Regions:
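Exposed substrate/partner-binding surface patches
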Residues: 2-23, 44, 53, 57-63, ...
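Glycine- and acidic
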Residues: 21-25, 98-101
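Short N-terminal secondary-structure initiator segments
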Residues: 22, 26-45, 127-140
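Generic detector of ordered secondary-structure context
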Residues: 27, 32, 63, 67-70, ...
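Active-site nucleophilic cysteine motif
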Residues: 28-43, 70, 104-115, 289-292, ...
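Carboxylate-rich, divalent-cation-coordinating active-site regions
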Residues: 35, 174, 244
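Papain-like cysteine protease catalytic cores
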Residues: 46, 50-186
């Protein structure tokens, strides 16, 4: 028998059978300025592939998997009918990683997401399969690719890599247009610039990949001398969940972000994949004080989560000009 719960807000007095199926619907207790954490967790837990993977591993048999075990316990509580969850233990675990999470001050949601995923990755090292994708054929690129593979991906092998971790390719280009060096870096959230002439997410992704001049020189093997150079950053691999954030310095002044329900990677990369908007985080406030909430798609309905409270919303009310972090899921 499924869980029966009342959805408050725009559809009050209606009751919905939420069942035991993914994704789960629940509120999170605000422990004191922890809306940044609650909204982040709502979006992360809306990643169905992650939840299904965690449920299929023997978490409780491994005491080292503290964060994964806490997620498992929370999901078990939801299955038993709880629709109000206390995330204190998750906060305490991350407080041992980052001291600021021991306290009750407002923090940045995008930073929390990065730290949460990195800590979960450490715990899940060696658990599940990891598939290497898009190995380059060019020898210079392949050498740089394998360097990151050995340094990061092979040392953190886990199913979490394909879900949340992508690769950036950085080309170091001299003033005469020669590629002097190539480096690969990993990412789990992509922090985008916000140019004054556009607020469209696809435009921001294009600007992110433009050449950026560096006030320095680099040795160019082709020119056989030190040359001024620029760096071109390319989005090389995109994981199953593509997390996009606005730069911290610009979220207080922009006029509203435009983002599609379906994001096509061919519009900003050489790859052709489609991603569907899975959830996103909203911030209303200024640098000193504000409130984070989340909107998530669950069972073909959209919900707005504000800590312990949540409500179902109409599809034409999904878009929000105050969105600052977007979660896209590969279709």
């Amino acid at each position: 028998m499924g869980i029966i719960c009342e959805i408050v807000g725009s559809c009050c007095n209606k009751r919905y059978n939420l069942g035991y199926n993914y994704p789960f619907i629940f509120g999170l207790k605000n422990l004191g300025n922890t809306c940044f954490m609650n909204s982040s967790l709502q979006c992360i837990f809306n990643s169905n592939k992650l939840i299904k993977k965690l449920e299929n591993i023997h978490i409780k048999k491994n005491p080292k998997l503290r964060l994964a075990n806490e997620i498992s316990l929370m999901l078990n509580d939801i299955k038993k009918g709880q629709i109000f969850i206390d995330p204190k233990n998750i906060k305490d675990i991350l407080g041992e990683v980052e001291e600021k999470y021991k306290y009750f001050e407002q923090n940045d949601a995008n930073e929390f997401i990065t730290i949460f995923l990195n800590e979960l990755l450490k715990e899940l090292n060696g658990i599940g399969e990891y598939k290497t994708e898009n190995i380059p054929k060019d020898e210079l690129e392949k050498k740089a690719f394998n360097k990151l593979e050995d340094k990061f991906f092979n040392k953190n092998k886990s199913f979490l890599l394909n879900l949340f971790y992508g690769r950036l390719k950085r080309q170091y280009i001299c003033e005469n247009g020669h590629i002097c060096a190539i480096k690969f870096n990993n990412f789990n959230t992509l922090i985008l610039p916000h140019p004054e002439d556009s607020n469209d997410i696809v435009d921001l992704l294009k600007v992110y990949q433009k050449n950026k001049s560096i006030d320095d020189t680099i040795f160019c093997n082709t020119c056989q001398s030190e040359k001024k150079y620029s760096i071109k950053t390319l989005i090389y691999n995109i994981p199953d969940y593509f997390i996009l954030c606005l730069e911290k310095e610009t979220i207080y002044s922009y006029s509203g972000l435009k983002y599609p329900k379906i994001l096509e990677t061919k519009d900003f990369t050489n790859n052709s994949s489609k991603y569907s908007l899975n959830s996103f985080i909203i911030y209303i406030g200024d640098r000193e004080r504000g409130h984070y909430t989340a909107k998530c798609e669950k069972n073909n309905n959209w919900y707005h989560f504000s800590d312990a409270n949540y409500k179902i919303i109409e599809e034409n009310n999904i878009h929000d000009k105050n969105a600052i972090i977007l979660f896209y899921e590969k279709i």
